């Protein structure tokens, strides 16, 4: 276990258990690197550099895109800042570029916490926690929890954004299996739209098959 000083990705925490090694950064509570016997299990990024897109980030209080940054909740309309202009969307929440705090640390685990204050597009309060744990036999586990510490009910979603890899080889030959039988179609800006059976969009991965040239930027259910 090792902590480095502040840089583009905040602080860096290095964890190890058996043949597994992980690098966690405090900005976005991100997973910057995960290896087994030296082989990469996620696409890594250098903590001293700004990562590609939301590589490795925790996405709170929503993952994916909200078209035009506009949503309705309990009869009221809210407007979020547009942070992906190519899709004209509010993407991946409000904590991906915040510097989380390290609250607990061991040789094999780290706990990070963050406070999300109210804002005009999301006037709710959350206290969030992420725990990364390495086990020499089972590898990495991630636990994410958020508590609504405001006085009214809050809309909430969560996701994580690692880019899985088999030691940085091409995904075309990978076998992919996902136990989901529904998927959201996307519009020309990759915003999710209507729910379909996976067969309708030719995205049925309930049985393992090669990814090949299939483009997957969808929400499955």
Give the role of each language-model region:
Residues 12-14, 21-23, 109-113, 129-131, ...:
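Beta-strand secondary-structure signal
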Residues 15, 116-156, 160-167:
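Acidic, contiguous internal or C-terminal segments within carbohydrate-active enzymes
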Residues 33-37, 89-93, 121-125, 151-157, ...:
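A short, polar/proline- and glycine-enriched secondary-structure boundary/capping micro-motif
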Residues 163-221:
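Active-site/ligand-binding surface loops and adjacent short beta/alpha elements
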Residues 1-80:
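Beta-strand-rich N-terminal accessory domains
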Residues 2-3, 82-136:
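Extended, loop-rich substrate-binding clefts of extracytoplasmic carbohydrate-active enzymes
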Residues 23, 65, 73-85, 172-175, ...:
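Surface-exposed interaction patch
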């Amino acid at each position: 276990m090792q902590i480095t000083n502040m840089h583009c990705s905040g602080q860096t925490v290095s964890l190890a258990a058996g043949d597994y090694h992980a690098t966690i950064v405090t900005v976005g509570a991100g997973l910057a690197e995960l290896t087994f016997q030296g082989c990469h299990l996620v696409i890594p990024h250098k903590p001293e550099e700004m990562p590609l897109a939301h590589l490795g980030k925790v996405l709170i209080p929503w993952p994916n895109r909200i078209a035009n940054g506009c949503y309705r909740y309990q009869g009221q309309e809210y407007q979020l800042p547009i942070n992906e202009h190519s899709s004209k969307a509010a993407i991946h929440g409000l904590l991906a570029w915040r510097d989380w705090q390290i609250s607990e640390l061991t040789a094999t685990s780290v706990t990070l916490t963050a406070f999300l204050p109210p804002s005009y597009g999301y006037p709710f309060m959350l206290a969030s926690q992420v725990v990364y744990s390495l086990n020499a036999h089972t590898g990495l586990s991630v636990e994410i929890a958020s508590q609504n510490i405001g006085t009214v009910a809050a809309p909430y979603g969560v996701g994580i954004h690692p880019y899985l890899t088999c030691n940085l080889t091409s995904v075309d030959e990978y076998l992919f299996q996902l136990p989901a039988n529904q998927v959201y179609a996307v519009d020309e800006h990759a915003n999710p739209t209507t729910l379909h059976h996976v067969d309708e969009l030719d995205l049925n991965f309930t049985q393992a098959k090669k990814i090949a040239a299939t483009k997957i930027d969808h929400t499955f259910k």
